């Protein structure tokens, strides 16, 4: 009898053990990303996500999102954050900072409570959308509600949504303060306060708002700051508002190791011709092209479209709903090229971008660092090409010195091994719905990476929008004159652009 009971107990234990081993096999995990990675994300201590003893439901979301092992910043941050200690973390762009604070934040949420338990602040609307999506993706099995709120959208909609339980609030400082001041967003029992891109959030324009927001939180809150750069103002905030923070610095060098940087000296009027040459010679999966002004963004996007390449553009003057659509469609691979201002330099994670082009060279090292960090994400390879004119030569030298990096002259032929992958269709993309994902994957598989001219041709009508959606309509006469001056710099004849419409495919 005793032997029978022992055998039965043993079989039960074996069954439970087998069930424990099999749970991961039952997950709907994406195909493994086979691209090589640099030491920016592979130089780890060898920890696994299971070593953090987090909820099974959270691990399910992590693995189903395609995560395999924690990156260095995640290894350093997650165990400390789970204890509730304040954290000041500095790591390179594209090394997994977002998941480093999202995972412990999700772990500490009590889904049975209806109170807001975490506030995540970011400096831009696009980054707010992206961060909230990471929270929803990783926490999809936890039964929690994540809400994103930013300026440029209806305040009444946010007020209505806050009538329901919101466990994690992600937003830009101004809008969150507006909701908290009106008593709509209750942060009185919100123990977690996170700032991503903290150097930007603690700039003079945001600091007063941040300090007001902190006053709505309980005194025993946990404050976590994440950024690639930490100016002196961060130290002032740390001394004033943080309690014995655990400091993490993984910045042995500032630029990502997987990004190869080149410059090309070119006269202003020859820049478009140079860009056309780059498009014809490079194997671009997706590219982001940066300009220093919104006028130049629109004009360059129009010119690229006229050259026969698919192109979107985005800048701060566009309506928020149109910016959102451009961002969403570009992330999902609808278009190969995006022209933008510095609106998208911070935190935006688009795995498929393998080329960044600075059509206009930035004025400072911080902007340069954030721009080129849009390629080479999460330890992968990327290319940064800078078009330099005579006036930029001193900035080029200054940025090299400040970042401790070398920007080389562009060679006649660029080695494809530096930025091209054998199977670009396997690069992970955000999934909005399965049917859309299948359609995008099929498009990528059936389109040659070198045949860019016929991928979403500019006048096909698919993304040809009426004037007023990010076009020239509605501007003052002075802005139109400014646009005309910029147009002449690109080599357009006088009076070519009437200012009434734009043929660049935007939304």
Swiss-Prot record:
Native source organism of the sequence: Aspergillus fumigatus (strain ATCC MYA-4609 / CBS 101355 / FGSC A1100 / Af293) (Neosartorya fumigata)
Similarity-based family: Belongs to the DEAD box helicase family. DDX6/DHH1 subfamily.
Regions of compositional bias (Polar residues) in chain numbering: 495-507
UniProt KW keywords: ATP-binding, Cytoplasm, Helicase, Hydrolase, mRNA processing, mRNA transport, Nucleotide-binding, RNA-binding, Translation regulation, Transport
Protein name from the UniProt record: ATP-dependent RNA helicase dhh1
Chain's role: ATP-dependent RNA helicase involved in mRNA turnover, and more specifically in mRNA decapping. Is involved in G1/S DNA-damage checkpoint recovery, probably through the regulation of the translational status of a subset of mRNAs. May also have a role in translation and mRNA nuclear export.
InterPro entries named in the record: DEAD/DEAH_box_helicase_dom, Helicase_ATP-bd, Helicase_C-like, P-loop_NTPase, RNA-helicase_DEAD-box_CS, RNA_helicase_DEAD_Q_motif
EC number: 3.6.4.13
Region spans: Disordered: 445-507
GO cellular component: cytoplasmic stress granule; P-body
Signal peptide: none
Domain observations: The Q motif is unique to and characteristic of the DEAD box family of RNA helicases and controls ATP binding and hydrolysis.
Lineage: Eukaryota, Fungi, Dikarya, Ascomycota, Pezizomycotina
GO function terms (MF aspect): ATP binding; ATP hydrolysis activity; mRNA binding; RNA helicase activity
Major site of localization recorded for this protein: cytoplasm
Motif DEAD box in this chain: 196-199
Reactions catalysed according to its record: ATP + H2O = ADP + phosphate + H(+)
GO terms (BP aspect): mRNA processing; mRNA transport; negative regulation of translation; P-body assembly; stress granule assembly
Binding site for ATP: 91-98
Domain Helicase C-terminal, residue spans: 258-418
UniProt short sequence motif Q motif, positions renumbered to this chain: 47-75
Sequence ranges assigned to domain Helicase ATP-binding in this UniProt record: 78-248
UniProt keyword annotation of ATP-binding present: yes
Compartmental location: Cytoplasm, P-body
């Amino acid at each position: 009898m005793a032997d029978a009971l022992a055998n039965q107990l043993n079989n039960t234990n074996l069954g439970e053990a087998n069930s424990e081993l099999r749970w991961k096999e039952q997950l709907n995990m994406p195909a493994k990303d086979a691209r090589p990675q640099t030491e920016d994300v592979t130089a780890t201590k060898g920890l696994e996500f299971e070593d953090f003893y987090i909820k099974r439901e959270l691990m399910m979301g992590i693995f189903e999102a395609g995560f395999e092992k924690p990156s260095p910043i995640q290894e350093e941050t997650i165990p400390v954050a789970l204890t509730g200690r304040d954290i000041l973390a500095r790591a390179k762009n594209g090394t997994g900072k977002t998941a480093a604070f999202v995972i412990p934040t999700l772990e500490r949420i009590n889904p049975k409570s209806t109170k807001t338990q975490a506030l995540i602040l970011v400096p831009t609307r696009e980054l707010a959308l992206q961060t909230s999506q990471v929270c929803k993706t990783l926490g999809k099995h936890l039964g929690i509600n994540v809400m994103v709120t930013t300026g440029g959208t209806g305040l009444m909609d946010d007020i209505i949504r806050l009538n329901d339980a919101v466990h994690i609030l992600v937003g830009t400082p101004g809008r969150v303060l507006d909701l908290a001041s009106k008593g709509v967003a209750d942060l009185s029992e919100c123990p977690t306060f996170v700032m991503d891109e903290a150097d930007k959030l603690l700039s003079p324009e945001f600091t007063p708002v941040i300090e007001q927001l902190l006053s709505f939180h309980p005194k025993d809150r946990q404050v976590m700051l994440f950024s690639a750069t930490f100016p002196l103002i961060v130290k002032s905030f740390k001394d004033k508002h943080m309690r014995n923070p655990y400091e993490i610095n993984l910045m042995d060098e500032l630029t990502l190791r997987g990004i190869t940087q080149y410059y090309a000296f070119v006269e202003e009027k020859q820049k478009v011709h140079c860009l056309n040459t780059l498009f014809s010679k490079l194997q671009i999966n997706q590219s982001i092209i940066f300009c220093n002004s919104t006028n130049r963004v629109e004009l360059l996007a129009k010119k690229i479209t006229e050259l026969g390449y698919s192109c979107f553009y985005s800048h701060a003057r566009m309506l928020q709903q149109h910016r959102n659509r451009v961002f969403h469609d570009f992330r999902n691979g609808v278009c190969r090229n995006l022209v933008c201002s510095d609106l998208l330099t911070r935190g935006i994670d688009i795995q498929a971008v393998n080329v960044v082009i600075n059509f206009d060279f930035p004025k400072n090292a911080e902007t340069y660092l954030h721009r080129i960090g849009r390629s080479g994400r999460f330890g992968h390879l990327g290319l940064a090409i800078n078009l330099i004119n005579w006036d930029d030569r001193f900035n080029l030298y200054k940025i090299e010195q400040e970042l401790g990096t070398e920007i080389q002259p562009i060679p006649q032929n660029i080695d494809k091994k530096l930025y091209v992958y054998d199977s670009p269709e396997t690069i992970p993309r955000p999934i909005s719905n399965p049917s859309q994902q299948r359609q995008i994957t099929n498009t990528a598989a059936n389109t040659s990476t070198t045949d860019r001219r016929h991928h979403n041709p500019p006048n096909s009508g698919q993304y040809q929008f009426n004037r007023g959606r990010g076009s020239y309509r509605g501007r003052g006469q002075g802005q139109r004159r400014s646009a005309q001056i910029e147009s002449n710099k690109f080599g357009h004849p006088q009076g070519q652009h009437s200012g009434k419409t734009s043929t660049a495919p935007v939304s």
